[in-house]
Amino acid sequence: MKHILIRSGKSPFYVAPPEEVIHRDLIGTNAGNLLFSDAMHKILLADRTTVTSNGISTDWSAKRAAQINEAYDAFVVPLANAFRPSYEASLNRLSKLIEQLTIPVVVVGVGAQTGVDYDTGRLKAMEPAVRRFMKAVLKRSASIGVRGELTADYLKQLGFTDVDVIGCPSMFLHGDTFPALDKKPQGLTDDSRVAINLSFAASKVGPLAAITQRAYERFPDLTYFAQNTPDAELLFWGDTSIAANASPTLPLERAHGLLRENKMRVPLDPYTWMRDLSGFDFSFGSRIHGNIAALLSGTPAMVLCHDSRTLELCRYFDIPHQKLKDLPADTEPAELYEKADFSALHNGHKERFDRFIAFMDRNGLENTFSHGDGGAVFEKEMAALELPPSIEVWDGGDDGALGYRVARLREQIAQTGQKHKDAEGRARRLEAKNKELEGRVRELEKHLNGSPLKRVTGAKKGLMVRLGPAIRRRLRRTSSKS
């Protein structure tokens, strides 16, 4: 039996209520992370394999590394856009852990993130971190699996050639087959159910707000599927934007129409996410995994690419896409639906799957499709779970989590009070230190006013006479800031 440790927010079989998902951030800030980690979990469950979730945070202590070396035969690390400046600290923590491991380490689906122009210049400063990570991984595996050609070229420029382009494991949830994506001959109508997904960084690249507003006005049955932890917190806790009479242009506050009308959801598990999306006619937006979830459920989708992480995957898998920066503000979802062509996606899927399986074979990993039941037991177990529904807009009533909300608010009040006490203590200590320094300054002035100072003339004397008052002024300013 082979025991595999996988980096993931949680096991697919672990059922967590909304408050736990938010409190522990089990989605790792983005529900898309669970989509590809759940897919990898299923793929790895061969007949002679067990798979255990390590969680999303990285404990790189020597104790944890020793535990992993003792208990597991391999560490599988599914990643997304890890080669980006904001992820550098997390990447370094992963490197520190991997450098202590004596078992194989297999990285799946890692990517570089830059603009749609593929200019990797912004990644220059983090090259040492990327090199360290790559060296640590490749000492423990035959190759590293990347999202697309951009990432492969970037790593080759850094001197790494043991790289396989495999895309994202989420697209192989169903193995070498892919769901049919049938479009209605009449296109989208006013009665069509349309799902939209948004990443707010994309609004700086193209007319995302305007396109969202047009879709909201055009389709009464429009639903916004958000993915990030702050989105879940907004739905779970609410805010004061309605009372403040705010008029947000994007659904970042409760005052937006999509939230006022309870047309926003945050999925907690990939399988409820896909189940929800299976009832829609079309999905579009700037979230790559939001649209992959739709495709996996059999719902046609179109990605509005705003950076390399989305564009790279769309190009590799032939997912229908448009560059957001090239779209006019009056773009209609019906136009995107009409342009969506899934023939290349379907025609090339088996070849891409075979390439993915070859990567796994090269790295000594069995898979459920070649060495198991094709995921049948996994799917049966998932179907038997009572997974919580996607989070909706909280109306202030008793949804079963009122006790948690009260307890959490009490904790935050207590933590805030303790922080104030700690700050006051630091201020008192600083004030005492300032008084001590002022006393030393006075002693210095007395010394300077003695007979030795009389022998000092000219510029040196003026400098020394001004020294005491200048120091006192600096101390007073420091004391006032505290």
Predicted regions and their residues:
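Active-site anion-handling motifs in enzyme catalytic cores
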Residues: 1-464, 468-479
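A C-terminal cap/extension of S-adenosyl-L-methionine-dependent methyltransferases
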Residues: 482
